Curated annotation (Swiss-Prot):
Family listed: Belongs to the XseB family.
GO BP annotations, alphabetical order: DNA catabolic process
Record's subcellular location: Cytoplasm
Reaction catalyzed: Exonucleolytic cleavage in either 5'- to 3'- or 3'- to 5'-direction to yield nucleoside 5'-phosphates
Matches recorded under Pfam families: Exonuc_VII_S
GO molecular function ontology, one term from the record: exodeoxyribonuclease VII activity
Function: Bidirectionally degrades single-stranded DNA into large acid-insoluble oligonucleotides, which are then degraded further into small acid-soluble oligonucleotides.
Name used for this protein in its record: Exodeoxyribonuclease 7 small subunit
Gene Ontology terms: cellular component: cytosol; exodeoxyribonuclease VII complex
UniProt cross-references to InterPro entries, sorted A to Z: Exonuc_VII_S, Exonuc_VII_ssu_sf
Signal peptide: none
PANTHER family in UniProt: EXODEOXYRIBONUCLEASE 7 SMALL SUBUNIT (PTHR34137:SF1)
């Protein structure tokens, strides 16, 4: 059986923002703060990886002949 459906970027950001809010309150027990921090780091990496993937996709545009070419902002 496959693992849970992969979290979207938006879902990960929302969860990360929630963790940051909890940690900023300052009344979180140390053990919970460490667990929140670890989860936040995982979510941060997930978001970073998704952004890198999108960035790589945007580096290329499809020509009329179907050939992928690097995107140049000057051509836009």
């Amino acid at each position: 059986m496959s693992e849970e459906k992969e979290m979207t970027f938006e879902e990960a950001m929302k969860q990360l923002e929630s963790i940051v809010e909890k940690l900023e309150e300052g009344n979180v027990p140390l053990e919970d703060a460490i667990a929140f921090f670890q989860e936040g780091m995982k979510l941060s990496k997930l978001c970073h990886d998704k952004l890198q993937h999108v960035e790589k996709q945007l580096e290329y545009m499809l020509r009329e002949d179907g050939e992928l070419v690097p995107f140049s902002p000057e051509e836009a």
